[in-house]
A protein has these predicted regions:
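Glycine-rich loops and low-complexity Gly/Arg-rich segments
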Residues: 6, 33-38, 77-82
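A short glycine-rich, Lys/Arg-flanked "PGG" loop and its adjoining helix->strand segment in the class I
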Residues: 1-8
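Short, conserved beta-strand edge motifs with alternating hydrophobic and charged residues
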Residues: 10-13, 54-56
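Short gly/pro-enriched beta-turn/loop segments at secondary-structure junctions
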Residues: 9, 38-39, 109
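Short amphipathic alpha-helical segments, especially helix-boundary/capping motifs
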Residues: 2, 15-20, 87-92
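Short, glycine-/aromatic-enriched active-site segment of Class I SAM-dependent methyltransferases
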Residues: 11-32
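Conserved Class I S-adenosyl-L-methionine
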Residues: 54-124
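Short alpha-helix
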Residues: 33-55
Length: 124
């Protein structure tokens, strides 16, 4: 278990807002079973014997901020390190990722933070 009895666990996890298109799954390099929906994330904690205390999801604006900063950092790195042997691969990957986010990701995948309590008496 991740924490002692009487302790808390804070988990950040993606969740499906809707059924993921197969083209988006290909961009992610994954499958539908990698994530639950928001309720499923809470239920997974309950199934692990934890008590949900709070949950919050990122807004579209917050998700955009994260994705654009991620893409921008890779673009900047490649621009500043053009001789890096992985530069072309990195640039290709981030541009496919960004296109996938704009086509499908923003409406399909969300991000939540989940606070759980582990029942029991703390021993330390």
């Amino acid at each position: 278990m991740w924490t002692q009895p009487g302790g808390y666990v804070l988990i950040g996890e993606g969740y499906w807002k809707r059924k993921a298109p197969s083209d988006y799954l290909a961009v992610l390099g994954g499958n539908e079973q990698e994530y639950f929906d928001h309720r499923g994330n809470v239920q997974a904690g309950i199934d692990a014997g934890l008590v949900p205390m709070h949950a919050v999801v990122a807004s579209d604006d917050e998700w955009d901020e994260y994705e654009w900063k991620y893409a921008r950092s890779i673009e900047r790195f490649v621009r500043e390190q053009p001789d890096d042997p992985d530069a072309v691969t990195m640039l290709d990957r981030i541009r496919r990722w960004r296109d996938g986010y704009l086509r499908w990701g923003r409406d399909t995948l969300g991000f939540g933070a989940y606070l759980f309590y582990r029942p029991g008496i703390r021993t330390t």
